[in-house]
C-alpha cells in the first residue's frame, strides 16, 4: 500500500510530500551529509584554462621562456663524460634563442681548445653573449685537438645555455651550461611573472658569502680533444696534475687537491708531475650541494692512502745528456741527480684558498704519505730556448691498501665542498719548496735521475673566482645569427630522455633538492611552472606549483627513498601535464592560423571550448600526504589505545552519512503515515 498509496496521492498532498523531500535534500546539501554521491569541490578550473576558450590569439606576453639544465635529470657531468656529448661539424650555421630565466647550475664548462697548428678551434662569442651567471663549479678545459669542423654542436640536440641566450654552438672562453629551453603559458594576470630584474646583480651581492652564491673554477688540460683517445689532466697547479681515467665528482677533485697541497706532494721544481688515481678508489664521493651549507662528502681522502709510483712513459733516453744540479731559478735549464724535490716534504702548514672573495685556511694532514719509486725513461721536450731537455713525468698511485677501520669516518656536518676548494697558487713554479732541497728525505729513491723543465704555458690558479663581468646581453636579433626558438631541438621531445638518475655504487643518493632561478624575484609565482613544454633530451620535465619550497620532500623523496607509489604519481603527473600543455599549445597555434577568419570559436561555435583541467594541485597534495604519512612519520604501535580511537574516528563521516540516510527514510515514512 505504501508505494501504491504514494502514486495515488491527490495533487495537494503530493505537493506537500515533494516539499518535505526537497527540504531534506537541501538540508543535506547545506550540511554536506553524504547520500552516497561524493563531490570533490577542490577541483577548480584556473585562469590558464580559460585562455583556451578565447576567440583570438592571446598576447605573446603570456609565454615565458626558461632554461632548464640537463644535469637535473642525472646526466654525467664530469668532463670526460660531458665532452663526449659534443662534436664538431661544418656547414651548419649556429642558432641562438633568448630565454628569460635560468636555473642555477651545479656544473658549467669553459673551453679554450686550439688546433695542432696553434689556431683556435672555437669561435669567439658574439657581442651580447656572456657566460652563464650561476655555476657552482666551472670546469675550465684548455688543450689541443683536431677539431674537425667549424663549430662544436651538441650531439643530442640540446642547447648550450649562456646568460639569457641559448646557442647551438660552444663559444671560446665563455662559460656555459647544457640545457634546454622551456616555455611557460601564463594567464594575463601573471604576465609579469618574471619581473624586471637587473641582468647583473651588484658585485657586493655576489661576493657576500651569506648570499650563498660563490663559484669554484676547476682547471683541466686536454690532449686530443674531441677524439676517442682524449686524455684529461686535472690541474692542481701549473706543474702538478692528476690523470683522469674514470668519472670524478668535483668534490673528489677538491678533496684530492687539498690532500696534495697539505701533504706536500706538489712538484717542487720546474718539472711536470703527474699523478694517477688507482681505479679501486671511489671517485664518486659527495652529493649535490646546490648552494646549501650542508654535509656533502661521505668521507675525506687521507694522506695515508697516497703512495707515489714512478712509471715509464715509453720514451727513450737521449744519449749524451749529462745530469747537472738544480737551481731554484725557473729560468735555469739544468738537470739534477736528485729528484726528491719533485714532491716536497715540507710544504707550508697553512695553505690559503680562495672562494668568491673569502679566504680559508686548510691545515696540514697529520700523516704524510708513503712514497716509493722505480726507474723510468725520460721524455724529451723542447725548452723555451729551443733546446732539448728531459722532462720527468711522475704518477701518483692512490690506493686503499693502508686503510684502517678506525680511519673510516665521515666528515663533520660543517664540511662542504665550498669549504674545501682547491688551493690557489701564484703563476709560475713555486719557489718556497725549493729552498728546502737540502733537507734529507727517505721518501724517494735517489737512483732515478730527473731534469727540470719550464712549464709556464700552463701557469695559473686551479681555483679562481668565476667572475661575471660585461655589459647587458643583447637580444638574439642583434647577434647577426639565425634566431630559432624551437627548430633545433623540437624533434627531441620523444626518444632522448633518461628516465632516472644514474645509480653510482658506493655513493650517496644524488638528487637536485632545490630549484633556483636567477631572474625572478618571487619564488611563490611558480604557478606557471606546471605548464612547461620542454625541448631537447634529458630535460627534467615538469616543475609543478609549490615545488619551489617543498621539492625536498617531493623530488628527493622520490629518488632517495624510492617510494614506488610516489614515483608512479609523479610520472602520471608528468604525462598528464605534458598532454595538457601540448593541447593548449596546439589550440593557440590553431587560433593563430584561423585568426583572419575570426578564430576557432567563430568557426566552430560553442563546441570550440575545451578545458583540459589541471590536476597538478591534487596530485601534489596526494604526494605530500604519502610522504607525510609513510616517510616522515614512524608507524604507530598497533597496541596503542590512540590507534583504536583513530581507527574508530575515521568511521565518523561514513556513520554520519548512513545516519542521514536513515533519518531521511524515517522522515519520509512518517510523512506518508501522516498523509494517510
From Swiss-Prot:
<keyword id="KW-1084">Inhibition of host tetherin by virus</keyword>
<keyword id="KW-0261">Viral envelope protein</keyword>
<keyword id="KW-1164">Virus endocytosis by host</keyword>
<keyword id="KW-1161">Viral attachment to host cell</keyword>
<keyword id="KW-1160">Virus entry into host cell</keyword>
<keyword id="KW-0945">Host-virus interaction</keyword>
<keyword id="KW-0564">Palmitate</keyword>
<keyword id="KW-1234">Viral attachment to host entry receptor</keyword>
<feature type="disulfide bond">
    <location>
        <begin position="108"/>
        <end position="135"/>
    </location>
</feature>
<comment type="similarity">
    <text>Belongs to the filoviruses glycoprotein family.</text>
</comment>
<feature type="glycosylation site" description="N-linked (GlcNAc...) asparagine; by host">
    <location>
        <position position="333"/>
    </location>
</feature>
<keyword id="KW-1133">Transmembrane helix</keyword>
<feature type="region of interest" description="Receptor-binding">
    <location>
        <begin position="54"/>
        <end position="201"/>
    </location>
</feature>
<feature type="compositionally biased region" description="Polar residues">
    <location>
        <begin position="433"/>
        <end position="464"/>
    </location>
</feature>
<keyword id="KW-0165">Cleavage on pair of basic residues</keyword>
<dbReference type="GO" id="GO:0098670">
    <property type="term" value="P:entry receptor-mediated virion attachment to host cell"/>
</dbReference>
<feature type="glycosylation site" description="N-linked (GlcNAc...) asparagine; by host">
    <location>
        <position position="413"/>
    </location>
</feature>
<feature type="topological domain" description="Extracellular">
    <location>
        <begin position="33"/>
        <end position="650"/>
    </location>
</feature>
<feature type="site" description="Involved in receptor recognition and/or post-binding events">
    <location>
        <position position="63"/>
    </location>
</feature>
<feature type="glycosylation site" description="N-linked (GlcNAc...) asparagine; by host">
    <location>
        <position position="462"/>
    </location>
</feature>
<feature type="site" description="Involved in receptor recognition and/or post-binding events">
    <location>
        <position position="170"/>
    </location>
</feature>
<feature type="site" description="Involved in receptor recognition and/or post-binding events">
    <location>
        <position position="57"/>
    </location>
</feature>
<feature type="region of interest" description="Disordered">
    <location>
        <begin position="402"/>
        <end position="479"/>
    </location>
</feature>
<keyword id="KW-1162">Viral penetration into host cytoplasm</keyword>
<feature type="glycosylation site" description="N-linked (GlcNAc...) asparagine; by host">
    <location>
        <position position="238"/>
    </location>
</feature>
<keyword id="KW-0964">Secreted</keyword>
<feature type="signal peptide">
    <location>
        <begin position="1"/>
        <end position="32"/>
    </location>
</feature>
<keyword id="KW-0175">Coiled coil</keyword>
<protein>
    <recommendedName>
        <fullName>Envelope glycoprotein</fullName>
    </recommendedName>
</protein>
<keyword id="KW-1043">Host membrane</keyword>
<feature type="site" description="Involved in receptor recognition and/or post-binding events">
    <location>
        <position position="95"/>
    </location>
</feature>
<feature type="glycosylation site" description="N-linked (GlcNAc...) asparagine; by host">
    <location>
        <position position="454"/>
    </location>
</feature>
<feature type="compositionally biased region" description="Low complexity">
    <location>
        <begin position="414"/>
        <end position="432"/>
    </location>
</feature>
<feature type="glycosylation site" description="N-linked (GlcNAc...) asparagine; by host">
    <location>
        <position position="317"/>
    </location>
</feature>
<feature type="region of interest" description="Mucin-like region">
    <location>
        <begin position="305"/>
        <end position="485"/>
    </location>
</feature>
<keyword id="KW-0472">Membrane</keyword>
<feature type="disulfide bond" description="Interchain (between GP1 and GP2 chains)">
    <location>
        <begin position="53"/>
        <end position="609"/>
    </location>
</feature>
<dbReference type="InterPro" id="IPR054584">
    <property type="entry name" value="Ebola-like_HR1-HR2"/>
</dbReference>
<feature type="glycosylation site" description="N-linked (GlcNAc...) asparagine; by host">
    <location>
        <position position="563"/>
    </location>
</feature>
<dbReference type="Pfam" id="PF22307">
    <property type="entry name" value="Ebola-like_HR1-HR2"/>
</dbReference>
<keyword id="KW-1168">Fusion of virus membrane with host membrane</keyword>
<feature type="glycosylation site" description="N-linked (GlcNAc...) asparagine; by host">
    <location>
        <position position="436"/>
    </location>
</feature>
Amino acid at each position: 500500500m505504501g508505494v501504491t498509496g504514494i502514486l495515488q496521492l491527490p495533487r495537494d498532498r503530493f505537493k506537500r510530500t515533494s516539499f518535505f523531500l526537497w527540504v531534506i535534500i537541501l538540508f543535506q546539501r547545506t550540511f554536506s551529509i553524504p547520500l552516497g554521491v561524493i563531490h570533490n569541490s577542490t577541483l577548480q578550473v584556473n585562469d590558464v584554462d580559460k585562455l583556451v576558450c578565447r576567440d583570438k590569439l592571446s598576447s605573446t606576453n603570456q609565454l615565458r621562456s626558461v632554461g632548464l639544465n640537463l644535469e637535473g635529470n642525472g646526466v654525467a657531468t664530469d668532463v670526460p663524460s660531458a665532452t663526449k656529448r659534443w662534436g664538431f661539424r661544418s656547414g651548419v650555421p649556429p642558432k641562438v634563442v633568448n630565454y628569460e630565466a635560468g636555473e642555477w647550475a651545479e656544473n658549467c664548462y669553459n673551453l679554450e681548445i686550439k688546433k695542432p697548428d696553434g689556431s683556435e678551434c672555437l669561435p669567439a662569442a658574439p657581442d651580447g653573449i656572456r657566460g652563464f651567471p650561476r655555476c657552482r663549479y666551472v670546469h675550465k678545459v684548455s688543450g689541443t685537438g683536431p677539431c674537425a669542423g667549424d663549430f662544436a654542436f651538441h650531439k643530442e640536440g640540446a642547447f648550450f645555455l649562456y646568460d639569457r641566450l641559448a646557442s647551438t654552438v660552444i663559444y671560446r672562453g665563455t662559460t656555459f651550461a647544457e640545457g634546454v629551453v622551456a616555455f611557460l603559458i601564463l594567464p594575463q594576470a601573471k604576465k609579469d611573472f618574471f619581473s624586471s630584474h637587473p641582468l647583473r646583480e651588484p658585485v657586493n651581492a655576489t661576493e657576500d658569502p651569506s648570499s650563498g652564491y660563490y663559484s669554484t673554477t676547476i682547471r683541466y688540460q686536454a690532449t686530443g680533444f674531441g677524439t676517442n683517445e682524449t686524455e684529461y689532466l686535472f690541474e692542481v697547479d701549473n706543474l702538478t696534475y692528476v690523470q683522469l681515467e674514470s668519472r670524478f665528482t668535483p668534490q673528489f677533485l677538491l678533496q684530492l687537491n687539498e690532500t696534495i697541497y697539505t701533504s706536500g706532494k706538489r712538484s717542487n721544481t720546474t718539472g711536470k708531475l703527474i699523478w694517477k688515481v688507482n681505479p679501486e678508489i671511489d671517485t664518486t664521493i659527495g652529493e649535490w650541494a646546490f648552494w646549501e651549507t650542508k654535509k656533502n662528502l661521505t668521507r675525506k681522502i687521507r694522506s695515508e692512502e697516497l703512495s707515489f709510483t714512478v712509471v715509464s712513459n715509453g720514451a727513450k733516453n737521449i744519449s749524451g745528456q749529462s745530469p747537472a744540479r738544480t737551481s731554484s731559478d725557473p729560468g735555469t735549464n739544468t738537470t739534477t741527480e736528485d729528484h726528491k724535490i719533485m714532491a716536497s716534504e715540507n710544504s707550508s702548514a697553512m695553505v690559503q684558498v680562495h672562494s668568491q672573495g673569502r679566504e680559508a685556511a686548510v691545515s696540514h694532514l697529520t700523516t704524510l704519505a708513503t712514497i716509493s719509486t722505480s726507474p723510468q725513461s725520460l721524455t724529451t721536450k723542447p725548452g723555451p730556448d729551443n733546446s732539448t731537455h728531459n722532462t720527468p713525468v711522475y704518477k701518483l698511485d692512490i690506493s686503499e691498501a693502508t686503510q684502517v677501520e678506525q680511519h673510516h669516518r665521515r666528515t663533520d656536518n660543517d664540511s662542504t665542498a665550498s669549504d674545501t676548494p682547491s688551493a690557489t697558487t701564484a703563476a709560475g713554479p713555486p719557489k718556497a719548496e725549493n729552498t728546502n732541497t737540502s733537507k734529507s728525505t727517505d721518501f724517494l729513491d735517489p737512483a732515478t735521475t730527473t731534469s727540470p723543465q719550464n712549464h709556464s704555458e700552463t701557469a695559473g690558479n686551479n681555483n679562481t673566482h668565476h667572475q661575471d663581468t660585461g655589459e647587458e646581453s643583447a637580444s638574439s636579433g642583434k647577434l647577426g645569427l639565425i634566431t630559432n626558438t624551437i627548430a633545433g631541438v623540437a624533434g627531441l621531445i620523444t626518444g632522448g630522455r633518461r628516465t632516472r638518475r644514474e645509480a653510482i655504487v658506493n655513493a650517496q643518493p644524488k638528487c637536485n633538492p632545490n630549484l633556483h632561478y636567477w631572474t625572478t624575484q618571487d619564488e611563490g609565482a611558480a604557478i606557471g611552472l606546471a605548464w612547461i613544454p620542454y625541448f631537447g633530451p634529458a630535460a627534467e620535465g615538469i616543475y609543478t606549483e609549490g615545488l619551489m619550497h617543498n621539492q625536498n620532500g617531493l623530488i628527493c623523496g622520490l629518488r632517495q627513498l624510492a617510494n614506488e607509489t610516489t614515483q608512479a604519481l609523479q610520472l602520471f603527473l608528468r604525462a598528464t601535464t605534458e598532454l595538457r600543455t601540448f593541447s593548449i599549445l596546439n589550440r593557440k597555434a590553431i587560433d593563430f592560423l584561423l585568426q583572419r577568419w575570426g578564430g576557432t570559436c567563430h568557426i566552430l561555435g560553442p563546441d570550440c571550448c575545451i578545458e583540459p583541467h589541471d590536476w597538478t594541485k591534487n596530485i601534489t597534495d596526494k604526494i605530500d600526504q604519502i610522504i607525510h604519512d609513510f616517510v616522515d612519520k614512524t608507524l604507530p604501535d598497533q597496541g596503542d589505545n590512540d590507534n583504536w580511537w583513530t581507527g574508530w574516528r575515521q568511521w565518523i563521516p561514513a556513520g554520519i552519512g548512513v545516519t542521514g540516510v536513515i533519518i531521511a527514510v524515517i522522515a519520509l515514512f512518517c510523512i506518508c503515515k501522516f498523509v494517510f
